[in-house]
């Protein structure tokens, strides 16, 4: 008998519920997409290195990672990065480049329409 595996991380389940609610009330599809990506198994969550953010992001852009940001590589520009988790080295490298680290919850509060956000996977 196959059943649906329930997430045991209370922060993650709360975030998924909040994103779905924001998607419904604001009719913003980006939050539904992120909620669906976070509902997938943990092994399917994104793991993005700083080097990939540096390659695909423009100066001052907002990047959303539905998973963890890792510290491999260099960051040469100031970007705002929202993610589920950050490694310690990623936080220090983003701060060194005068960028900003934030949670997905903070991004949702600051930008409820989800405009001008780039999703990296």
UniProtKB/Swiss-Prot annotation:
GO terms for cellular component: cytosolic large ribosomal subunit. GO terms for biological process: translation. GO terms for molecular function: RNA binding; structural constituent of ribosome. Keywords: Ribonucleoprotein, Ribosomal protein. The keyword Ribonucleoprotein applies. PANTHER family: 60S RIBOSOMAL PROTEIN L18 (PTHR10934), LARGE RIBOSOMAL SUBUNIT PROTEIN EL18 (PTHR10934:SF2). HAMAP family: Ribosomal_eL18. Belongs to the eukaryotic ribosomal protein eL18 family. This is Large ribosomal subunit protein eL18. It comes from Methanosphaerula palustris (strain ATCC BAA-1556 / DSM 19958 / E1-9c).
